[in-house]
């Protein structure tokens, strides 16, 4: 599997092929102990992401009941992270053994990765544009920032992410290399240019276009806030801005390495040492990018005031139900605290626009 050249969902590969006509350049980087540690890391990411994003969905659906367009975007962003992380169990098994799930699942699991990648960046872009409209064009935003509009845009994002992913999956297959079944994307002499195009497409759709929109939106927002000095609007964009910055920090390094890999495929960068360095850089930056799927819930917990209150409310209700099931009465102090949290949350709803 040509892992460095192809953004695959798997990391078991031991060799990097700088050219389809040359012999492989030995770039074995992950030894047995390293694979075990990496597998444990993926398992931890899976657990924390599954738990964190499930709590986000629970808060948005049960507590906030999707009352705003931003709630819709945050819900879909959490679903995108969950879709991304669903590839981890397959990836972990593949890392430790071989691909035993067949060609169809090879394409499906790889699709989870790509769709999760594209949709995550697209939803963050939508949230940035939404903040821009809410702050800079507040009157116009009242007309267009509706639940129906948000749902329609989210459906468009999912469709775009799927359409961007489907051409990539055509080349994925399962083949045996040295007696080990591997899931990888195969490119021959005729399709090698398509592979390079795919890498550049990911750079453009996954980083360049979103980053350009981010810069435009937040420059305009900061200019507007500087003029108006509106504290409520400043609070309203803080969470989204932190999510955007975090996503860029996790994904920019990988996109840079992907771009350099494309240059290597075109022989602009050449040499065995370059290929080994790119292989190593891909592994490292991919691990960094994978971590993004469990970061957003942590940001909400530390930055989102209402998110913490809603979690406290859910915890109190759950404890109350457990006490009732056991035939006991919940301590009065906890009930009063839960009631106080609910009242305070309702009073602050007019101030905080998002989690």
From Swiss-Prot:
<dbReference type="Pfam" id="PF00001">
    <property type="entry name" value="7tm_1"/>
</dbReference>
<dbReference type="InterPro" id="IPR017452">
    <property type="entry name" value="GPCR_Rhodpsn_7TM"/>
</dbReference>
<dbReference type="GO" id="GO:0019722">
    <property type="term" value="P:calcium-mediated signaling"/>
</dbReference>
<keyword id="KW-0807">Transducer</keyword>
<feature type="topological domain" description="Cytoplasmic">
    <location>
        <begin position="305"/>
        <end position="355"/>
    </location>
</feature>
<feature type="transmembrane region" description="Helical; Name=6">
    <location>
        <begin position="239"/>
        <end position="263"/>
    </location>
</feature>
<dbReference type="InterPro" id="IPR050119">
    <property type="entry name" value="CCR1-9-like"/>
</dbReference>
<dbReference type="GO" id="GO:0007204">
    <property type="term" value="P:positive regulation of cytosolic calcium ion concentration"/>
</dbReference>
<keyword id="KW-1133">Transmembrane helix</keyword>
<feature type="topological domain" description="Extracellular">
    <location>
        <begin position="1"/>
        <end position="35"/>
    </location>
</feature>
<feature type="topological domain" description="Extracellular">
    <location>
        <begin position="264"/>
        <end position="280"/>
    </location>
</feature>
<dbReference type="GO" id="GO:0015026">
    <property type="term" value="F:coreceptor activity"/>
</dbReference>
<keyword id="KW-0297">G-protein coupled receptor</keyword>
<feature type="topological domain" description="Extracellular">
    <location>
        <begin position="94"/>
        <end position="107"/>
    </location>
</feature>
<feature type="transmembrane region" description="Helical; Name=4">
    <location>
        <begin position="147"/>
        <end position="171"/>
    </location>
</feature>
<dbReference type="GO" id="GO:0016493">
    <property type="term" value="F:C-C chemokine receptor activity"/>
</dbReference>
<dbReference type="GO" id="GO:0007155">
    <property type="term" value="P:cell adhesion"/>
</dbReference>
<keyword id="KW-0812">Transmembrane</keyword>
<feature type="transmembrane region" description="Helical; Name=1">
    <location>
        <begin position="36"/>
        <end position="63"/>
    </location>
</feature>
<feature type="disulfide bond">
    <location>
        <begin position="106"/>
        <end position="183"/>
    </location>
</feature>
<dbReference type="InterPro" id="IPR000276">
    <property type="entry name" value="GPCR_Rhodpsn"/>
</dbReference>
<dbReference type="GO" id="GO:0005886">
    <property type="term" value="C:plasma membrane"/>
</dbReference>
<dbReference type="GO" id="GO:0004950">
    <property type="term" value="F:chemokine receptor activity"/>
</dbReference>
<feature type="topological domain" description="Cytoplasmic">
    <location>
        <begin position="130"/>
        <end position="146"/>
    </location>
</feature>
<comment type="similarity">
    <text>Belongs to the G-protein coupled receptor 1 family.</text>
</comment>
<feature type="topological domain" description="Cytoplasmic">
    <location>
        <begin position="223"/>
        <end position="238"/>
    </location>
</feature>
<keyword id="KW-0472">Membrane</keyword>
<keyword id="KW-0675">Receptor</keyword>
<dbReference type="InterPro" id="IPR004068">
    <property type="entry name" value="Chemokine_CCR8"/>
</dbReference>
<dbReference type="GO" id="GO:0006935">
    <property type="term" value="P:chemotaxis"/>
</dbReference>
<dbReference type="InterPro" id="IPR000355">
    <property type="entry name" value="Chemokine_rcpt"/>
</dbReference>
<feature type="transmembrane region" description="Helical; Name=2">
    <location>
        <begin position="74"/>
        <end position="93"/>
    </location>
</feature>
<comment type="function">
    <text>May regulate monocyte chemotaxis and thymic cell line apoptosis. Alternative coreceptor with CD4 for HIV-1 infection.</text>
</comment>
<keyword id="KW-1015">Disulfide bond</keyword>
<dbReference type="GO" id="GO:0006955">
    <property type="term" value="P:immune response"/>
</dbReference>
<protein>
    <recommendedName>
        <fullName>C-C chemokine receptor type 8</fullName>
    </recommendedName>
</protein>
<dbReference type="GO" id="GO:0060326">
    <property type="term" value="P:cell chemotaxis"/>
</dbReference>
<feature type="transmembrane region" description="Helical; Name=7">
    <location>
        <begin position="281"/>
        <end position="304"/>
    </location>
</feature>
<feature type="topological domain" description="Extracellular">
    <location>
        <begin position="172"/>
        <end position="202"/>
    </location>
</feature>
<keyword id="KW-1003">Cell membrane</keyword>
<dbReference type="GO" id="GO:0019957">
    <property type="term" value="F:C-C chemokine binding"/>
</dbReference>
<feature type="transmembrane region" description="Helical; Name=5">
    <location>
        <begin position="203"/>
        <end position="222"/>
    </location>
</feature>
